[in-house]
From Swiss-Prot:
This is Protein phosphatase PP2A regulatory subunit B. One of its GO terms (biological process) is positive regulation of transcription by transcription factor localization. Gene3D superfamilies: YVTN repeat-like/Quinoprotein amine dehydrogenase. It holds the Pfam family WD40. GO terms for molecular function: protein phosphatase regulator activity. It comes from Saccharomyces cerevisiae (strain ATCC 204508 / S288c). Residues 398-421 have a biased composition (Low complexity). GO terms for cellular component: cellular bud neck; cellular bud tip; cytoplasm; cytosol; fungal-type vacuole membrane; mating projection tip; nucleus; protein phosphatase type 2A complex. Keywords: Cell cycle, Phosphoprotein, Repeat, WD repeat. Phosphatase 2A affects a variety of biological processes in the cell such as transcription, cell cycle progression and cellular morphogenesis, and provides an initial identification of critical substrates for this phosphatase. The regulatory subunit may direct the catalytic subunit to distinct, albeit overlapping, subsets of substrates. Disulfide bonds: none annotated. Belongs to the phosphatase 2A regulatory subunit B family.
């Protein structure tokens, strides 16, 4: 489905809409669409997983499916530490035999859940259905209190087998596998491999590889723990498998680097990696640089060609074939650059914002404060020759690199086949010209056909929407451009507690699910 309409409108909201005191256990900590987009899962700080099912194929509408307790609070007696029940991440597997499977994790334990429709049957007919008949005999022996004996009139011919009938259907969730006791530190990421047989889990210092069918054994593929912990200079912040090549995965660090690894080269992927890192002039370093440059989330584009990384102040788009600098750097909430001391005092500077690609690999979204989230339409475009580029305001951008080509031969070969189809699909009805001149490179990123309704003639390179109770009021708030401009105008009024950290983009259309404290908002361009 072409994803060239960016006229996002509010569709649904799940949760308490009134101004009530929000309990900490109700805060949503994970949001994830499945591969089809017909199912949506959320996890919260209380260890619960809530599933939603699409109820209307033409419009983006979902209904509640089921809820279950995925994790409970535990206590590590060896370390005297409490293990939170908070759901850190949820990942869907592909469905099999009318059952759905998903992985959920807290800080220490990963669980594989099977969600299926269960029939409840009751006994509708048996030998006592019609009751028991009694006969009264006149003989004095074997008599009852009323002077007669009691016997059931049941002949051999009248005996029946019990019959079951359909009573009800429920959605049941059962844990199929529990993967535990493999991480010393807190798990921050899980990622399912494209082979649908293995997945990885990452904590602060190690990354483990699991087989879905073997819960009691994992293989350590990355270990950055130094011999002397006083020499520790960085930690792992996120990890993800390549969406098409099952031998490739990447992980990010608190130093602002991304490392792409090939499991075919070595069993322990610590050293032989391709490192994506941007040079920072030491003159521009300050007290907060080390904190703000820490990458909180990384994502592959669905076609596997690009990488999006998010740190506190920027989103960076990388080409897997060019590791010396990003193709594009998008500045996020620039208003905070002069207020980093305030964010440090209230710990907001440590917030871990996510980043996400659209299903066609052309656009990205991320979150901010005041319940705002930003969508950047058509950041990645392609020409007829399938050489994808990133729209940028820097005319001197040169997306070429010859380093470490051996690790990406499989990606480049696949670009001409699988990626080529998606590139051609995206080129229909969209400006796909290569950025070659200063005029075109400085032009705003067009909003595609989404501008043909209220915002015709208005080109937008950033859409700012708000996941707040104002979204479902009856009052109209103007065009997309007007709403976006109003949401950008923060002034000095910033609510750091209203931060959009978790969200998911529908894989086949421009519909997004956004977690705002204890509410789940759905916006759609359909």
């Amino acid at each position: 489905m072409a994803q060239n309409n960016f006229d996002f409108k509010f569709s649904q909201c799940f949760g308490d809409k009134a101004d009530i005191v929000v309990t900490e256990a109700d805060l949503i900590t994970a949001v994830e669409f499945d591969y089809t987009g017909n199912y949506l899962a959320t996890g919260d700080k209380g260890g619960r997983v809530v599933l939603f099912e699409r109820s209307n194929s033409r419009h983006c509408e979902y209904k509640f499916l089921t809820e279950f307790q995925s994790h409970d609070a535990e206590f590590d007696y060896l370390k005297s530490l409490e293990i939170e029940e908070k759901i850190n991440e949820i990942k869907w597997l592909r469905p099999t035999q009318r059952s759905h499977f998903l992985l959920s994790t807290n800080d220490k334990t990963i669980k594989l859940w099977k969600v299926y429709e269960k029939n409840i049957k009751l006994v509708s007919q048996n030998n006592l259905t019609e009751g028991v008949t009694f006969a009264k005999k006149g003989k004095p022996d074997n008599h009852n209190s009323r002077g007669g004996s009691v016997r059931a009139v049941l002949s051999l011919q009248s005996l029946k087998l019990p019959q079951l009938s359909q009573h009800d259907k429920i959605i049941a969730a059962t844990p199929k596998r529990i993967y535990s006791n493999a991480h010393t530190y807190h798990i921050n990421s899980i990622s399912l491999n494209s082979d649908q047989e293995t997945f990885l889990s990452a904590d602060d210092l190690r990354i483990n590889l699991w087989n879905l069918d073997i819960p009691d054994q994992s293989f350590n593929i990355v270990d950055i723990k130094p011999t002397n912990m006083e020499e520790l200079t960085e930690v792992i912040t996120s990890a993800e498998f390549h969406p098409q090549e099952c031998n490739l995965f990447m992980y990010s660090s608190s130093k602002g680097t991304i490392k792409l690894c090939d499991m075919r080269q070595n069993s322990l992927c610590d050293n032989k990696t391709k490192t994506f890192e941007e040079y920072l002039d030491p003159i521009n370093h300050n007290f907060f640089t080390e904190i703000t440059s820490s990458i909180s989330d990384i994502k592959f584009s669905p076609n596997g060609r690009y990488i999006a990384s998010r740190d506190y102040l920027t989103v960076k788009i990388w080409d897997v074939n060019m590791d010396n600098k990003p193709l594009k750097t998008i500045n996020i909430h620039e208003q905070l650059k002069e207020r980093l001391s305030d964010t440090y005092e209230n710990d907001a500077i440590f917030d871990k914002f996510e980043v996400n690609f659209s299903g066609d690999s052309s656009s990205v979204m991320t979150g901010s404060y005041n319940n705002n989230f930003m969508i950047y339409p058509n950041v990645v475009t392609s020409g007829d020759n399938d050489n994808g580029i990133v729209k940028t305001f820097d005319e001197h951008n040169a997306p070429n690199s010859n380093s470490n080509k051996n690790i990406h031969n499989s990606i480049q070969n696949k670009d001409s086949s699988s990626s080529g189809n998606s590139h051609k699909r995206r080129s229909n009805g969209r400006n796909t010209g290569m950025v070659g001149s200063s005029n075109s490179s400085r032009s705003s990123i067009a909003g595609g056909e989404g501008a043909n309704s209220e915002d015709s003639g208005t080109e937008m390179n950033e859409i700012v929407l708000q996941a707040d109770k104002t979204a479902f009021r009856n009052k109209r708030y103007g065009s997309l451009a007007q709403r976006s401009a109003r949401n950008k105008d923060w002034g000095d009024d910033i609510d750091f507690k209203k931060n959009i950290l978790h969200f998911s983009w529908h894989p086949r259309e421009n519909s997004i699910a956004v977690a705002a404290t204890n509410n789940l908002f759905i916006f759609s361009a359909l």
